[in-house]
Design a protein with these regions (language model features):
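Short glycine/serine/threonine-rich phosphate/pyrophosphate-binding segments
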Residues: 18-19, 94-99, 129-133
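Short Gly/Thr/Asp-enriched flexible loops that form oxyanion-binding sites at enzyme active sites
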Residues: 88-111
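Short acidic/histidine-rich motifs immediately flanking catalytic phosphotransfer sites
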Residues: 81-85
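Buried hydrophobic positions in well-ordered alpha/beta secondary-structure cores of metabolic enzymes
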Residues: 13-14, 87, 136, 154
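Accessory alpha-helical/coil subdomains and C-terminal extensions
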Residues: 4-6, 10-14, 35-44, 158-198
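Conserved hydrophobic helix-helix packing surfaces used for dimerization/oligomerization
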Residues: 7-9, 113, 148
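ATP/NTP phosphate-donor binding region
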Residues: 1-78
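Internal gly/pro-rich beta-alpha loop/helix module
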Residues: 115-185
């Protein structure tokens, strides 16, 4: 992995950053970066450099609107030349819709924009957020994809072909009518024949 790669992580809200409160798990401003820095893998020398942009207020993905899509697009546009790729952390309820919208909004894209999130908050035991965010960052830094996509539960999907299939399974998303762009296992296996050329 090229350690000079720079990835912009855009935290819009969602389950991945929720923390416990007297009312259950809730989103809370300012707590996600410490959670992110607690992940051992991101301190490895071969891991890409990254910078976090946190939305204020954090978005409830069940209430996301066109204006929120525009805001995400503007954040990417304003930082486009500074970074090699983007990871958008988003609630799962409408992640596929936002990824699809951004795929049409971001014209002539030649860098990866990878959406991800989690079914279990990052602060909890067994959180799927750990795998999802680490692999999403590595995919964004790989230079192998140049489009809006969605990584979740070991699958890299084309953003505008993805859909949420389960509210409970960790493999929550799929693209039933389109092949996966990649899968993760011991290695990240890219399917170059279905990835759009740069």
């Amino acid at each position: 992995m090229n350690t000079n790669k720079r990835i912009c992580i855009i935290y819009t809200g969602g389950t991945i950053g929720m923390v416990p409160s007297e009312h259950g798990y809730v989103p809370k401003a300012g707590v996600f970066e410490p959670l992110l820095r607690s992940i051992n893998d991101i301190h490895r020398p071969e891991f890409p450099d990254w910078e976090l942009v946190e939305f204020s207020p954090l978005l409830d993905s069940s209430n996301i609107a066109v204006g929120d899509w525009n805001k995400i697009g503007r954040v990417i546009d304003q930082r486009y030349d500074e970074f090699d790729g983007f990871v958008v952390l988003h609630g799962t309820d409408t992640m596929a819709y936002t990824a699809s919208a951004l795929s049409f909004m971001l014209e002539n894209l030649n860098k990866p924009v990878v959406f991800t999130g989690s079914q279990i908050p990052l602060c909890m035991l067994r959180s799927d957020g750990l795998d999802n965010i680490v692999n999403a960052i590595l995919i964004a830094a790989s230079g192998r994809v140049h489009e809006v996509c969605l990584y979740f539960g070991g699958r890299l999907l084309r953003g505008n072909r993805s859909t949420k299939m389960s509210a409970d399974l960790l493999e929550a998303f799929d693209s039933p009518n389109a092949p996966h762009l990649a899968e993760t296992g011991i290695d990240i296996q890219y399917h170059d024949t279905v990835i759009r050329p740069k």
